[in-house]
Swiss-Prot record:
Role, per record: The UvrABC repair system catalyzes the recognition and processing of DNA lesions. A damage recognition complex composed of 2 UvrA and 2 UvrB subunits scans DNA for abnormalities. Upon binding of the UvrA(2)B(2) complex to a putative damaged site, the DNA wraps around one UvrB monomer. DNA wrap is dependent on ATP binding by UvrB and probably causes local melting of the DNA helix, facilitating insertion of UvrB beta-hairpin between the DNA strands. Then UvrB probes one DNA strand for the presence of a lesion.
Family designation: Belongs to the UvrB family.
Organism domain of life: Bacteria
Gene: uvrB
KW rRNA processing (keyword) present: no
Record key words, sorted: ATP-binding, Cytoplasm, DNA damage, DNA excision, DNA repair, Excision nuclease, Nucleotide-binding, SOS response
Protein name (Swiss-Prot/TrEMBL): UvrABC system protein B
Length: 651
């Protein structure tokens, strides 16, 4: 069995050894929950990796957004190059949920754009969890959403070995059952036959094909082939073909599920008729019968996840299968930036109840569709394994769960202190932050500026660009892989200033940043709370020149508390440096190959002159409006905007 082994030129230093020992001791003694309070730049990721190495237990690290998850994934891959470090996030680049608007009698069909590369990584994650123990999965909260049963997924795999008696026709039937497509194109999830050779492109790989040669009904050879060059890269003795969908179901189970679906359909149609809802009764019968026929013929149908209750053999109201069910019982769960991630997990369940209720009440879906859902918070609590909450500002929940006790990690291995905080008046803040940015850039450093709204971020970006500054903005409308690319460009110097809103807080690891400007710091609210301010201040804590300017006309309670906590930490760090004769130095961290490059992001290279083309500007604005309408459940308007975008982008 492959063991976890960290590959790093660094050794634990500062208070890292104490934090690692404390967490490992707690896990060894059976502590179910612990909290690591670690300041930005103190090496929390290295501490997590060290805990994994010392305990030799599989792990899942949950982050609250895809950008942070991608960053953690890159770091963990560098620490564990010989182990399986996987990435599991939502594979939707665009998602318009199925919905019905009763007021206008408009049904909106589900519309989604799936990122095939992220789907590949999801399959790679589940495959690794089922095949080996040296696995670290970095995930978003997508890990608490419904996923196919791990038992069925594992049961459906097809093992093949040299010398095995195997009928090629039966193997082709099995591959179709696993949702592989027959075709000559070398694409993931396809297979083809040429004479006595069957070629299959596995669901969890993007760069290799397995060629299985037969001599009669016996497997004669198994070769791994590069799909681009056609060269044989490896000769194998055995392989295991995993399903091309997490919702594959053995034929007998599928037929049993169809029987149960038909029973519910009869009951549902009868209830509608008894209520004199003839249109709804006809609608549910027509739609469900079509799905049933598709499942009988192909083993799947559009929206098959809505029948997951039956496919997984569950009762009404039972928790769905999720990625957590694929984890070994002794796995460790790290909740990164827990003050943000835990509330996000808590909020997931209620998100789509109203939308599904409308679909069910009007005959578009049966009540069993409600079981296609994320875990409730209580269900997540029941299923979570050994947990370590990780944050510079742990929330009330985490501290309650651990009895108010947290393992502190305040000393940075580099000797860096928390940044100096300066308060300046908010009047004239734009001019001042511009001048401060130019001075910082002239010294070869980067700048982060945080605003209160997306519009402010975009306007400030446009203004700074007009003034000759290389700048980009970062907010929730920017696609996942594009965010990763923008952060990489900032580190490489393609851009010098990054303007953002809430995304500027947790997890942005940019050692080149020597200035953080917080506009309107005295506007009390979520974005300017004590926790938010401490997190934002921490973005400047990776550079020896790091400083923070808070623009405010009054010092609020949140500002005072944040600055006092920063000063407390600075005092502890300064004393430690004096006692150990440490001279602070800026973190040295190479810019690694971005996830978007590795998964082959299909997006075009982001232009740093965004919104200069009027047509492009119109499309960007329409996309923002469409997403806002979807968030507000105005699906009818969202569809109209989507159609307009398609018209504008048509060749």
């Amino acid at each position: 069995m492959q063991r976890f082994k960290i590959s790093s030129e660094f050794n634990p230093s500062g208070d890292q050894p104490g934090a690692i020992d404390s967490l490992v001791r707690g896990i060894s003694c059976g502590a179910k929950e612990q909290t690591l309070l670690g300041v930005t730049g103190s090496g929390k990721t290295f501490t997590m990796a060290s805990v994994i190495e010392q305990t030799q237990r599989p792990a899942i690290i949950i982050a609250h957004n895809k950008t942070l998850a991608a960053q953690l994934h890159e770091e963990m891959r560098s620490f564990f190059p010989e182990n399986a470090v996987e990435y599991f996030v939502s594979y939707y680049d665009y998602y318009q949920p199925e919905a019905y608007i009763p007021q206008s009698d408009v049904y909106i069909e589900k519309d989604a754009l799936i990122n095939d590369k992220i789907d590949l990584l999801r399959h790679s994650a589940t495959r690794s969890l089922l095949e080996r123990r040296d696995v670290v999965v970095v995930a978003s909260v997508s890990c608490i959403y419904g996923l196919g049963s791990p038992e069925l997924y594992s049961e459906m795999t097809v093992p093949i070995a040299l010398g095995m008696k195997l009928d090629m026709c039966q193997l082709q039937e099995r591959l179709v059952e696993l949702q592989y497509k027959h075709g000559n194109r070398y694409e993931r999830g396809n297979f083809s036959v040429q004479g006595d050779v069957l070629s299959v492109f596995p669901s969890h790989y993007e760069d290799r094909i397995w060629k299985i040669s037969f001599f009669g009904d016996e497997v004669d050879s198994i070769q791994e082939v590069d799909p681009k060059s056609g060269m044989v890269t490896l000769k194998l003795e055995k392989i295991k073909i995993f399903p091309n969908s997490h919702y594959v179901t053995p034929r007998p189970t599928l037929l049993q599920a169809i029987s149960e679906i038909e029973k519910e359909l009869d009951e549902c149609a009868l209830q509608f008729k008894q209520c004199n809802k003839i249109v709804e009764a006809d609608r549910i019968v027509e739609r469900t019968r079509f799905d049933i026929e598709m499942m009988r013929e192909t083993g799947t149908c559009k929206g098959i996840e809505n029948y997951s209750r039956y496919l997984c053999g569950k009762e009404a109201g039972d928790p769905p299968n999720t990625l957590l069910d694929y984890l070994p019982q002794d796995a460790i769960m790290f909740i990164d930036e827990s003050h943000m991630t835990v509330p996000q997990i808590r909020a997931m369940y209620n998100g789509d109840r109203m939308r599904k209720a409308n679909l069910i009440n009007h005959g578009f879906r049966m009540p069993s569709a409600l079981d296609n859902r994320p875990l409730t918070f209580a269900e997540w609590e029941d299923r979570k394994p050994t947990v370590v909450y990780v944050s510079a500002t742990p929330g009330q929940y985490e501290l309650q769960q651990t009895g108010g006790v947290a393992t502190e990690q305040l000393i940075r291995p580099t000797g860096l202190l928390d940044p100096v905080c300066i308060v300046k008046g908010a009047d004239g803040q734009i001019h001042d932050v511009m001048c401060e940015s130019q001075a910082t850039i002239a010294r070869g450093y980067r700048v982060l500026i945080t605003t209160l709204t997306k519009k402010m971020a975009e306007n400030l970006t446009e203004y700074m660009r007009e003034m000759g500054i290389k700048v980009a903005y970062l907010h929730s409308d920017v696609k996942t892989l594009e965010r990763i690319e923008i952060i990489s460009d900032l580190r490489l110097g393609v851009i010098d200033v990054l303007v953002g809103v809430n995304l500027m807080r947790e997890g942005l690891d940019i050692p080149e940043c020597a200035l953080v400007g917080i506009l309107d710091a005295d506007k009390e609210g979520f974005l300017r709370s004590t926790t938010s301010l401490i997190q934002t201040i921490g973005r400047a804590a990776r550079n020896v020149e790091g400083r923070v300017i808070l623009y405010a006309n009054v010092i609020t309670k949140s500002m005072r508390t944040a600055m006092e906590e920063t000063d407390r930490r600075r005092d502890i760090q300064r004393k430690y440096n004096q006692e150990h004769s440490i001279v602070p130095r800026t973190i040295q961290k190479p810019v690694q190959t971005s996830l978007s490059e590795r998964v082959g992001s299909s997006r075009k290279k982001v232009s740093r002159d965004t919104n200069t083309d009027p047509a492009n500007r119109d499309i960007v604005e329409l996309q923002k409006e469409m997403l806002l309408c979807a968030e507000n459940l105005d699906f009818e308007r969202a569809v109209e905007i989507r159609n307009e975008i398609k018209r504008l982008t048509a060749p």
